[in-house]
């Protein structure tokens, strides 16, 4: 499958899995926003600490606005292979194209590590 138009860089699998782990920790001990609309609002308000975007979103226009918005607002973002993984990590029984971590809770150190590695990727 060709790379979607909104994917701007390749994320190593271990970094993607750490991002999902941070999302799960934030879900249990902090605060998250589930779905593209809520993630977009969190970025626009400047409260998102990390945005997780699925690479298999169809049609891609659903999340195509998120990477440029995150860059404009200096919000780190990461891609994971499947949106079903995003939904599961967010505690949903359905897939989710995107999610945002608002308060990392017990995953604060993990989140800081992810952000450092993302800055090195770009």
Curated annotation (Swiss-Prot):
Which Gene3D superfamilies does this one have?
3.30.1330.30
What is the protein name for this chain? Large ribosomal subunit protein eL8
* MF (Gene Ontology): ribonuclease P activity; rRNA binding; structural constituent of ribosome
Tell me one GO biological process term. Answer: translation
- Species of the source: Methanothrix thermoacetophila (strain DSM 6194 / JCM 14653 / NBRC 101360 / PT)
Question: Which terms in the GO cellular component ontology are assigned?
Answer: cytoplasm; ribonucleoprotein complex; ribosome
Where does the source fall among the domains of life? Answer: Archaea
Which residue pairs form cystines in this protein?
Answer: none
């Amino acid at each position: 499958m060709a790379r979607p138009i909104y994917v701007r860089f390749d994320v190593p699998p271990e970094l993607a899995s750490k991002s999902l782990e941070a999302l799960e920790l934030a879900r249990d001990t902090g605060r998250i926003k589930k779905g593209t609309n809520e993630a977009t609002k969190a970025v626009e308000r400047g409260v998102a600490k990390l945005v997780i975007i699925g690479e298999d979103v169809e049609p891609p226009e659903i999340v195509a606005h998120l990477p440029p918005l995150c860059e404009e607002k200096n919000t780190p973002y990461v891609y994971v292979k499947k949106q079903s993984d995003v939904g599961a990590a967010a505690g949903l029984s359905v897939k989710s194209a995107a999610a945002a971590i608002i308060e990392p809770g017990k995953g604060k150190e993990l989140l800081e590590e992810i952000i450092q590695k993302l800055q090195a990727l770009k």
